[in-house]
Amino acid sequence: MLRVGGVLAAAALVLSACGSDSESSVAADCKPAHDVSTVKEGVLTVGLTNTPPYSFEQDREIAGIDSDILKALAEEECLEIEHAPYTYAAAIPAVNTGRVDVAVGGFYRTEARAKETTLSAPLYVDELTVMSEDGYSTVDDLLGKKIGTVEGYLWVDALKALPGTDLRVYADSGALANDLKAGRLDAALDGYGAATISAKGTDFELAVLEEDDRVPATNEPSQTSMLVHPKDEALAKALDELVGAMREDGRLVKILGEHGLPETAAEVGEARLVS
């Protein structure tokens, strides 16, 4: 469990690291599509997790699938973008206390998160994927092995319960991949998109973990969302409408393709929550 003191310390570091993604990107005659309020007037403040290809920092700006959607939102609502780095554990408190307007990083739509904060409409689907030298693809393959995953994923508790398995939980996908590459893990479990990025330039094999009731997350692809401040109803509505429009006109599929996800990832179906 993350200590409260750790969260507060992380928050202090985050606030000092917050930066602007643009000096003057909003035209003087820009007219917003919606009447939204933000933590800082005229600015969309983003909590950015380091989880490529969903969200990451590149050239001191937000990047990734979720970030590209937010750039479109900022343009539509005449907002500058400022961002700060957050871990998954610190992102929800940051949103709920109003330090940021929105947090991004392929957050799965879980019942627990829905009780804590506002989830955007589903963005895309993601699947639990295994990276390994030996092509592991089943839960049985993982038993007795040293495996790792990223904090905040809905399958963490299920993996902890696997008998004889040594599970290590990491703050982000980069740290997870580094330990796999260093030989400290037999397998790394991540979302499909993140695993694809991590495996580039390596000999690791990727496999979507086969359905198994011991890990319920394998039974249905998870929908992802952004986290929005619970009181920012207008902002949440504007984001949901934009996502719907981007899905209809093909912009969302284009963004997914640019970051290595298949077109089918945009086929989210009806909004749902997983436990």
Labelled PLM ranges:
Residues 45, 49-53, 62-75, 107-108, ...:
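Bilobed "Venus flytrap"/periplasmic-binding protein-like clamshell domains
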Residues 20-26, 157-171, 175, 206-210, ...:
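Ligand-binding clefts/hinges and TM-proximal coupling segments of bilobed small-molecule sensing domains
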Residues 124-129, 202-240, 263-275:
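Periplasmic-binding protein-like
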Residues 14-17:
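C-terminal motif of bacterial Sec signal peptides marking the signal peptidase cleavage site
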Residues 80-142:
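Acidic, polar ligand-binding/catalytic clefts
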